[in-house]
């Protein structure tokens, strides 16, 4: 998963090493060859004229000779690419992509065009799978709308690395909550405790120059009722998404939602503090739900309409709780209770940057024009919010609550 999946099993490593040693007897005196150099040695055996191309027939012969070493779905994908080349040739870069599982837009298009070999039974029809294989298949059907992507993910996923980002963030949030609960002697509606806002992790408008608070507020929650839903959504939605798209991409969407949430509060609800990870959570969940809607016919997860309704109800209940708390009489006047605007900032990130990430499984984001459009929009918003925080509070002569 991620940008560079681990090399596939198309050619056994030992057999490949023996070929390289035979063709390059002085290899021991040089530095180890890069993986692409290994593939070049194998490619040249089928391209004696050094034309840079091999025939699809030779490529199919290579696959047939190593069929016992191939995952069945991987073999389908490779044959699909071979069948898609109308000129009957495969270039070296496509060959490297095939053998190392590196995929590009042109690579995906070629695979999708070679659909004759992809008409075999779907993953759902596979029998005799182990528990881990069923889990991987379940994650594939929960998150990916195309059968070719589901098969590719099923064959490529190795759980190395595991979904560490969402699990680590969740454990830290729970740990900070328990620590605060013990120190304050309060677990429900912790935010009403007089000493709650004194924590250096909370975003407070009077302390907005302390830039770490725009991010660290996610480790503080209003109470167990606030933490509970965020943790459940992070584990049920965030972890599967990270298993498919990788920690870098999902972490990017999550952190972008968190920062957008606090900046949105500093612009739209200028006197309120911010706590909770709802900005990041709503970014991931909104992106996931939007991706399901945009690929409705392709998504094969069970009871998707009912589950979407449940997710929307839970998100609405949490948002309603945040709105109620914001306008509830404050326990520490004149400072109001935490804002709900961070939720909206997270949704905005989810339906823009998040959707682009989820719709481009293992594709280069920098090749997507929408990606750059949304990155530009996000950058403009961040710069606007920074200038707003520097100048607007003074120009508006806003009376802020005293620092905690």
Swiss-Prot record:
<dbReference type="GO" id="GO:0005509">
    <property type="term" value="F:calcium ion binding"/>
</dbReference>
<dbReference type="Pfam" id="PF13499">
    <property type="entry name" value="EF-hand_7"/>
</dbReference>
<feature type="domain" description="EF-hand 2">
    <location>
        <begin position="70"/>
        <end position="105"/>
    </location>
</feature>
<keyword id="KW-0378">Hydrolase</keyword>
<protein>
    <recommendedName>
        <fullName>Rhomboid-related protein 3</fullName>
        <ecNumber>3.4.21.105</ecNumber>
    </recommendedName>
</protein>
<keyword id="KW-0677">Repeat</keyword>
<feature type="transmembrane region" description="Helical">
    <location>
        <begin position="218"/>
        <end position="238"/>
    </location>
</feature>
<keyword id="KW-0645">Protease</keyword>
<feature type="transmembrane region" description="Helical">
    <location>
        <begin position="164"/>
        <end position="184"/>
    </location>
</feature>
<dbReference type="GO" id="GO:0006508">
    <property type="term" value="P:proteolysis"/>
</dbReference>
<feature type="transmembrane region" description="Helical">
    <location>
        <begin position="303"/>
        <end position="325"/>
    </location>
</feature>
<dbReference type="InterPro" id="IPR002048">
    <property type="entry name" value="EF_hand_dom"/>
</dbReference>
<comment type="function">
    <text>May be involved in regulated intramembrane proteolysis and the subsequent release of functional polypeptides from their membrane anchors.</text>
</comment>
<dbReference type="InterPro" id="IPR022764">
    <property type="entry name" value="Peptidase_S54_rhomboid_dom"/>
</dbReference>
<feature type="transmembrane region" description="Helical">
    <location>
        <begin position="371"/>
        <end position="391"/>
    </location>
</feature>
<keyword id="KW-0812">Transmembrane</keyword>
<dbReference type="GO" id="GO:0016020">
    <property type="term" value="C:membrane"/>
</dbReference>
<dbReference type="InterPro" id="IPR017213">
    <property type="entry name" value="Peptidase_S54_rhomboid_met"/>
</dbReference>
<dbReference type="Pfam" id="PF01694">
    <property type="entry name" value="Rhomboid"/>
</dbReference>
<dbReference type="GO" id="GO:0004252">
    <property type="term" value="F:serine-type endopeptidase activity"/>
</dbReference>
<comment type="similarity">
    <text>Belongs to the peptidase S54 family.</text>
</comment>
<keyword id="KW-0472">Membrane</keyword>
<feature type="transmembrane region" description="Helical">
    <location>
        <begin position="250"/>
        <end position="270"/>
    </location>
</feature>
<feature type="transmembrane region" description="Helical">
    <location>
        <begin position="274"/>
        <end position="294"/>
    </location>
</feature>
<feature type="active site" description="Nucleophile">
    <location>
        <position position="278"/>
    </location>
</feature>
<dbReference type="InterPro" id="IPR035952">
    <property type="entry name" value="Rhomboid-like_sf"/>
</dbReference>
<dbReference type="InterPro" id="IPR051739">
    <property type="entry name" value="Rhomboid_IM_Serine_Proteases"/>
</dbReference>
<feature type="domain" description="EF-hand 1">
    <location>
        <begin position="34"/>
        <end position="69"/>
    </location>
</feature>
<keyword id="KW-0720">Serine protease</keyword>
<feature type="transmembrane region" description="Helical">
    <location>
        <begin position="338"/>
        <end position="358"/>
    </location>
</feature>
<feature type="active site">
    <location>
        <position position="343"/>
    </location>
</feature>
<keyword id="KW-1133">Transmembrane helix</keyword>
<dbReference type="InterPro" id="IPR011992">
    <property type="entry name" value="EF-hand-dom_pair"/>
</dbReference>
């Amino acid at each position: 998963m991620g940008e560079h999946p681990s090399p596939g099993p198309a050619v056994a490593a030992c057999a490949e090493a023996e070929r390289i040693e035979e063709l390059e007897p002085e290899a021991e005196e040089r530095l180890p060859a890069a993986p692409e150099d290994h593939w070049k040695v194998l490619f040249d055996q089928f391209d004696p004229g050094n034309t840079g191309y091999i025939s699809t027939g030779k490529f199919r012969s290579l696959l047939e000779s190593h069929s016992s070493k191939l995952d069945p779905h991987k073999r389908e994908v490779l044959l699909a690419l071979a069948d898609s080349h109308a000129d009957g040739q495969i270039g070296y870069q496509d060959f490297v992509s095939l053998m190392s599982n590196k995929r590009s837009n042109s690579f995906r298009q070629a695979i999708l065009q070679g659909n004759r070999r992809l008409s075999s039974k779907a993953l759902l029809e596979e029998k005799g799978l182990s528990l881990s294989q069923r889990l991987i298949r379940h994650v594939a059907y929960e998150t990916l709308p195309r059968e070719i992507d589901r098969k590719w993910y099923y064959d490529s996923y190795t759980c190395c690395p595991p979904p560490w980002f969402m699990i680590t963030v969740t454990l830290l949030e729970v740990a900070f909550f328990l620590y605060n609960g013990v120190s304050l002697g309060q677990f429900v509606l912790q935010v009403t405790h007089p000493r709650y806002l004194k924590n250096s992790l909370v975003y407070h408008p009077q302390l907005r120059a302390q830039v770490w608070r725009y991010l660290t507020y996610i480790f503080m929650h209003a109470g167990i009722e606030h933490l509970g839903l965020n943790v459940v959504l992070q584990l049920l939605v965030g972890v599967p998404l990270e298993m498919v798209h990788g920690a870098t991409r999902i972490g990017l969407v999550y952190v972008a939602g968190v920062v957008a949430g606090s900046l949105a509060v500093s612009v739209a609800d200028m006197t309120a503090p911010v706590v909770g990870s709802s900005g990041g959570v709503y970014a991931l969940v909104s992106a996931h739900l939007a991706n399901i809607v945009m690929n409705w016919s392709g998504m094969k997860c069970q009871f998707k309409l009912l589950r979407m309704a449940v997710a929307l109800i839970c998100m609405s209940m949490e948002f309603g709780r945040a709105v109620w708390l914001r306008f509830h009489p404050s326990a520490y006047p004149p400072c109001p209770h935490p804002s709900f605007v961070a939720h909206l900032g997270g949704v905005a990130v989810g339906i823009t940057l998040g959707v682009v990430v989820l719709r481009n499984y293992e594709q280069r984001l920098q090749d997507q024009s929408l990606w750059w459009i949304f990155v530009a929009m996000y950058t403009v918003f961040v710069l606007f919010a920074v200038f707003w925080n520097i100048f607007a509070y003074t120009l508006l002569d806003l009376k802020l609550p005293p620092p905690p």
